[in-house]
């Protein structure tokens, strides 16, 4: 592996380990947190690169199309991406989404040092690949095998650290909004549909940040709902607190979520949110956060074909528990028959207001008819995506374009 890295350094005329890597893994929130981290670094005048599900974004340029069909590139693709940018400094910051597949397959071998490594959360996903939740969790914790002075973990997952001998001498920094004895505790003091204010308490900051121990920082931002504040706290903790003040409120209103991540559609008469949620954990977190703001939630979503079948019924049950009306539709059925996918989902979930419309566009149009001013339509599963894969063929499709067609 060392010889491969030497060859790649020579071939591309770059030293990949001169860059500052900020790596984020988790069942949900990887795209948003890496994208937020990129924006924080840009606001601090650092040269930065975002790499992940959305594609690549260098500094303030538009997001470029994906480098491959993987969330996380392998080391060869990463060299190709960085070398193609011709960045002006000796090094830059790279904000990386790191998938469980990438960690299991050692795609990041060759990166000797991470500025920070984070586990945002661990739910249940990709069991078609990992086979069981234990193996899935093992892959996530492998991010902490990489050299990094800052290792952040959501407090609920910190208990699993004792299962990994390689962490016996490692400092993990826990983050929580529930446990005020966690290393980093944050508290939301004001929140609505458009704005949020919160405080961060540094009880036991990460390595290199000890100077900020016991300090309290105030922030305001335009993110919604509450789980995106968790993502923001991880991003802030990753870049460190040197650039923030504990004397006044730090204004982070410039931070935006990426397209299709809890995206409130603006300039229309109704309440519509498009989100990438596509597993039981993200469904539960999203719906429980959103429903407190509306009388009724109307959902449009489907289930990916040729993927983990065990999550389908769980997703539908969570949707039934947290909404008033559901439209089940297609979402990359791939080689599976739509009716078989729905049959899997409906096992034990026969009660509830469920309408089945295979054509995703028609499902969105019909769901929109039930909206009133106190309701919200959530179109879930595809987010930023602009394609549908059905029967081995890929078609152009965008949830955003359907909504735009309805209202404009």
Regions found by a protein language model. Give the residues of each.
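ATP-dependent carboxylate-amine ligase
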Residues: 2, 150, 169-171, 209, ...
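N-terminal leader/targeting and accessory segments in enzymes
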Residues: 1-10, 220, 226, 336, ...
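Short, basic phosphate-binding NTP loop
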Residues: 1-23, 32-46, 261-263, 368
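Conserved lysine of the Walker
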Residues: 30-33, 231
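Adenine nucleotide phosphate-binding catalytic loops in nucleotide-utilizing enzymes
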Residues: 130-137, 166-284
């Amino acid at each position: 592996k060392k010889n491969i890295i030497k060859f790649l350094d020579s071939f591309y005329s770059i030293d990949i380990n001169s860059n500052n890597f900020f790596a984020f893994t988790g069942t949900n929130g990887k795209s948003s947190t890496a994208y937020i981290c990129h924006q924080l670094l840009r606001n601090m005048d650092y040269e930065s690169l975002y790499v992940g599900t959305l594609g690549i974004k260098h500094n303030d340029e538009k997001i470029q199309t994906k480098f491959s069909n993987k969330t996380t590139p392998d080391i060869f693709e990463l060299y190709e991406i960085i070398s193609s940018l011709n960045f002006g400094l000796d090094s830059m910051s790279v904000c990386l989404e790191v998938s469980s597949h990438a960690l299991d397959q050692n795609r990041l071998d060759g990166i000797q040092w991470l500025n920070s490594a984070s586990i945002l959360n661990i739910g249940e996903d990709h069991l078609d690949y990992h086979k069981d939740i234990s193996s899935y969790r093992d892959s996530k914790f492998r991010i902490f095998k990489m050299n990094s002075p800052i290792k952040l973990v959501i407090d609920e997952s910190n208990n699993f650290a004792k299962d990994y001998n390689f962490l016996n001498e490692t400092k993990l920094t826990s983050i929580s909004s529930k446990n005020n004895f966690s290393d980093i505790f944050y508290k939301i003091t004001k929140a609505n549909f458009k704005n949020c204010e919160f405080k961060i308490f540094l009880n036991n900051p990460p390595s290199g940040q000890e100077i900020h121990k016991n300090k309290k920082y105030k922030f305001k931002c335009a993110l919604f709902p509450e789980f995106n504040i968790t993502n923001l706290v991880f991003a802030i903790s990753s870049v460190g607190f040197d650039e923030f003040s504990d004397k006044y409120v730090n204004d982070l209103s410039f931070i935006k979520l990426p397209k299709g991540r809890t995206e409130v559609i603006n300039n229309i008469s109704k309440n519509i949110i498009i989100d990438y949620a596509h597993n039981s954990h993200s469904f539960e977190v999203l719906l429980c956060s959103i429903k407190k703001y509306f009388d009724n939630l109307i959902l449009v979503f489907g289930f990916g074909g040729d993927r983990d079948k065990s999550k389908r019924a769980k997703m539908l049950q969570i949707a039934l528990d947290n909404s008033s009306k559901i439209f089940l539709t297609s979402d990359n059925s791939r080689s599976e028959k739509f009716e078989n996918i729905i049959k899997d989902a409906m096992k034990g979930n026969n009660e509830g207001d469920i309408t089945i419309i295979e054509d995703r566009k028609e499902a969105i149009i019909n769901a929109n008819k039930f909206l009133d001013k106190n309701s919200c339509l959530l179109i879930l599963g595809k987010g930023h995506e602009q394609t549908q894969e059905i029967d081995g063929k890929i078609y152009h499709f965008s949830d955003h374009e359907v909504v735009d067609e309805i209202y404009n």
